[in-house]
Amino acid sequence: EIPVNERPEIDQWIISELNTLIANVDAYYADYEPTKAARAISDFVQENLSNWYVRLCRRRFWKGDYAQDKIAAYQTLYTCLVTVAKLSAPIAPFFMDKLYRDLTQATGSESFESVHLAEFPKMVENFVDKSLESKMMKAQTVSSLVLSLRKKEMIKVRQPLQRVMIPVLDDNQRAEIEAVSDLIKAEVNVKEVELLDDASGVLVKQIKPNFKTLGPRFGKDMGLISKEIQNFSQEQIAKLERDSELVIDIAGKSITLSLDDVEISSQDIEGWLVANSNGITVALDITIS
């Protein structure tokens, strides 16, 4: 088997996400939270494994020659599927047993007759790379936002567009997005990814309170808090996006707001479409030359 640290970066990323999943699911089961475990597994399989890893690696799977790159892709996918079968066995016992036996009997990699006889997976800390996970999440978020804007304007992905602008909140975010800019360009079919200082003023942020989260948390103080949120400056909005929380003073009390407590959007610029999610804003140039 090819060592994980000798496989391509995208293989190392999905293995890192897999081991993060193992830790989370183990904790959910220990807390008697099977619903949270199921959601975590579902998100991993749909968003990370299927929509991202398998799709980006499809040319590696299709290769005619059985070289190391193709072997690494198959070994990585196999590890993910067998591990998912083991993680899901307590909540989907029959299907996961079938999946496990189909995978292991064909390869002879494990001697257990059933997934329910196999050991529950253990997280390997050396395989977890949080910086790589964060970097790839930026690529996923930007790509998802741009593709949603294309869909909104009914501009097909095969139609190249000139550029996408992304305001960055700090040097770390700039470095992470720069590292995956080629991947973003290939995914959304744009020629340029332009990173802006978030304080440049090109994009004007708007903010409004999220009453669904504020109401249960703050009750009668919600009115004062929502009024304060609506008066936030651009600097306060940027700090909230950068730090994922912001402390404000309401009637002599310190209140900590999170990104879940607000809805942040950006004003559209003529000839551009703007969207944001997870603290990332994109502006897509929709001019077709």
Regions found by a protein language model. Give the residues of each.
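Feature 926 captures the class I aminoacyl-tRNA synthetase adenylation module centered on the KMSKS loop
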Residues: 1-289
